């Protein structure tokens, strides 16, 4: 198989099925569709297990978009931010669906997105026998957002389907007018 030479790889993220997949996310310069190559670490799959093409919403700037995937999702879902919006990309259905908008400042930019990682949790801290706690960590998505005058961190609890949960406290906005967060370049989680 030949790869279109006009495609530029914008990111490679890992996730899906316990973290066994890598997704190479490519697009032509200033393009309005993504080509995603799915690579598998599973013996029964070919190394390049699939290729997907997804049309993007018109407001998405692929040059500045950020991407993430989580080990908790087996349904070929990746997540993308552009501007002040978060999208779920359903590779199997070939759709990008808007999940969240930071409405406080329409000119804000989501500059980082990261899922919590169960491998960072000590076994003794996971007191649920079913492992639900670790699974929920993989469905907790943090966003680093820069507005004109400050940084904001938003944490979203997602559902098994990759939607924002409708439960109470499923969207947490971390900001303090007394102690402004400066410009955000990345976010990480500390489990101490």
What are these regions (language model features)?
Residues 133, 137, 141-143:
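Hydrophobic/aromatic hotspots within intrinsically disordered, low-complexity regions
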Residues 40-43, 91-94, 159-160:
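Short loop/turn segments that connect beta-strands within beta-propeller blades
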Residues 19-20, 74-76, 139, 192:
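Short coil/turn segments that connect the beta-strands within blades of beta-propeller domains
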Residues 30-38, 84-89, 149-157:
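Structural motif
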Residues 24, 79-80, 143-145:
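Residue position within the beta-strands of beta-propeller blades
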Residues 122-132:
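Intrinsically disordered, low-complexity Ser/Thr- and acidic-rich flexible linkers and loops
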Residues 6-17, 58-70, 106-122, 181-191:
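Repeated scaffold domains used in trafficking and secretory/extracellular systems
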Residues 1-3, 48-58, 95-103, 167-178:
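A short beta-strand motif characteristic of beta-propeller blades
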């Amino acid at each position: 198989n030949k790869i279109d030479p006009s495609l530029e790889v914008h990111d490679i993220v890992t996730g899906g099925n316990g973290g066994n997949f890598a997704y190479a996310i490519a697009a032509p310069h200033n393009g309005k569709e993504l080509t995603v190559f799915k690579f598998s670490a599973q013996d029964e799959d070919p190394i390049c297990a699939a290729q997907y093409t997804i049309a993007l919403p018109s407001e998405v700037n692929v040059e500045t978009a950020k991407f993430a995937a989580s080990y908790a999702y087996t349904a070929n879902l990746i997540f993308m931010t552009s501007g002040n919006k978060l999208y779920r990309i359903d590779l199997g259905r070939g759709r990008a669906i808007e999940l969240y908008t930071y409405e406080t400042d329409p000119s804000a930019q989501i500059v980082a997105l990261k899922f919590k990682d169960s491998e960072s949790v000590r076994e003794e801290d996971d007191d649920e026998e079913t492992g639900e706690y670790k699974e929920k960590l993989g469905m907790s998505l943090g966003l680093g957002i820069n507005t004109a005058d400050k940084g904001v961190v938003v944490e979203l609890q997602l559902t098994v389907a990759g939607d924002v949960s409708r439960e109470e406290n499923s969207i947490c906005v971390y900001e303090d007018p007394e102690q402004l967060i400066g410009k955000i370049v990345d976010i990480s989680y500390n489990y101490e």
